[in-house]
Amino acid sequence: MTISNKSWRSYFPHLRKLPEDDQYLYSDDTNSSIIAEEELHHSVDKSSKTDVTAETTAVEPHPHNLRHDLPYEVRDEAGRKWWKYFDEFEYRVNKEYKKSRKWYEFLYPNHTTQTKAERRLLYKLDIIIALYFFMLCWSKSVDLNNYTNAYVSNMKEDLNMKGNDYVYTSTIANVGAIVFQLPFMYLLPRFPSHIILPVMDLGWTWFTFACYRANSLAELRAYRFILSAFGAAYYPVSQYILGCWYAPDEINSRVCLFFCGQQLGSVTSGLLQSRIFKSLNGVHGLAGWRWMFLIDAIAISLPTAIIGFFVIPGVPSKCYSLFLTDEEIRIARARNKRNQIKDGVDKSKLAPLWSRKLWKKVFCTPAFWVLVVFDTCSWNNMTAYSGSYTLWLKSNTKYSIAQVNNLSVIPACLGFAYVIFCAFGADLFRCKWIFMVFAAIMNTVSCALLIKWDIPSKAKWYAFFTTYFSVAASPCLWSFINDFLRFDPQVKAITWIAIYSFSQSTYAWIPTLAWPTVESPRFKTGYTVSLIFGAIYGLWTFVVLFFYKRNEKKHALGNGIILYDSNKGEELPEFVKKNMEERDGYYYLKRSS
């Protein structure tokens, strides 16, 4: 049913059933029994029962799991150069894709199977998904940063906050987010995201509103705990959805919008708090910081929740979108098949959450632990969100409260440029790791300067202005996680939540030890901890790259690459000789196959 239908269902999100759904959806992932694994040196995911090209034409799958619409590169691994280790897409795409891709089309990468219809789909996705998550992250960031701005705008004095009360309150809020993420291991693959996120956002809105009436520290902590519990879903669920719609060389720039929303929240929170404090402080007997919580809830968070219900599309295999046509849904599914992204599993085929086999698939995979370390380092090297810069400004008596709020937005404004540089650069050059290492280097230099502290004023301002490099490469990190986990939706949901919960749990207690408010404004311990995690983050990038390359090599056939190594006495696989023909340097299935 399309939006042109005038029944009531046309105006509310509903499951879009296509005629071929009974055949398309939820095929099992099994390895082909025809091609031996040792011959190919990779595992092959079983294709679903019908294939849809970008032209939305059905093609019967080949019994060897080879596709009629894909040119294959036969690659002899003999003599492989050492520097190929640093080629992130070595096994992710074949040379035909690399040649057809024009550098200036990195936002909408060119491929011979792409059509104008596919580009139109991407334009729509950028509007209804990427921009919505930009708005969602902005909404959340405004509130999270509002806590810091409220603290320096007399909330500290009004609620009699002393010593480390500021950081302890943040820790309590983090605990709420961590604990209430865990149920989404069960909910995410089973319930539509266009219901999950808006419902959680409504809870977030209510308790943001409640913060305005907090009359004691204990009351504020209770509200922040419950508020964070309702915000537990939006990070992992949003990334889960983005990973189901975008290809690996498209997703960095879209996740970039998510993080730009975060930076915009930092900017607008400071500016709004400054303006509200100046204009509304004392109006109707309410302090300026209380007005900010009221405005945040009613004018920002509530509209975001309502809009989300209508624009979040679900995933291609279970699409609820009002704005995508049937043909665009088919194209999205074909793109996922082309990129080996499995986005849906029938509920009846989901393993029970307590299944030992399921948890073994999660925890006994080396990539899980590699990504846990990676994300933990990412969380704990974040000087950008420590509040240290704002507290340093407040400690300088020459700045008024309004000036502190205005100046506090400068690093976040620069953060826009840093995030865009890393994310768009990663898509442009198809190379995430180099931008992650660069950001880690910049962050460690910033931390080193702030550890020394007694440095020229210009050097200190430079150090504070580069703190947002600690989050600049986060889109690249999350894109790595999405690409690692694209083969199994249930494992992806559990792994995303597990990685995120573990990493965030360390962020619940490490900042308490590393950034005690009593050390303000110098925070020598905090900058030292951030430097250590930042250095490990940069070095660990190469470990992640190793496991990523190993994983993609196993799935090279699905990416259009047939591998063998003549140095090991291997020959061209027999199925290539029997079932394929060479044309213009590539191998295609014979038309009779």
UniProtKB/Swiss-Prot annotation:
Pfam families associated with the record: MFS_1
Compartment list: Cell membrane
Segments crossing the lipid bilayer: 122-142, 167-187, 191-211, 225-245, 292-312, 362-382, 409-429, 433-453, 461-481, 493-513, 527-547
Membrane topology classification: Multi-pass membrane protein
One cellular component (GO) term of this entry: plasma membrane
Chief place where the protein resides: membrane
Hydrolase found in the keyword field: no
Highest taxon above the source species: Eukaryota
Listed GO MF terms: biotin transmembrane transporter activity; symporter activity; transmembrane transporter activity
Keywords in alphabetical order: Biotin, Cell membrane, Membrane, Phosphoprotein, Symport, Transmembrane, Transmembrane helix, Transport
Listed GO biological process terms: biotin transport
UniProt-listed SUPFAM superfamilies: MFS general substrate transporter
Stretches in topological domain Cytoplasmic: 143-166, 212-224, 313-361, 430-432, 482-492, 548-593
Residues exposed to the Extracellular side: 1-121, 188-190, 246-291, 383-408, 454-460, 514-526
Residues recorded with modification Phosphoserine: S32, S33, S43
Functional summary from the UniProt entry: Involved in uptake of biotin with the concomitant entry of protons.
Family assignment from sequence similarity: Belongs to the major facilitator superfamily. Allantoate permease family.
Name the record gives this protein: Vitamin H transporter
Species whose genome carries this gene: Saccharomyces cerevisiae (strain ATCC 204508 / S288c) (Baker's yeast)
Gene: VHT1
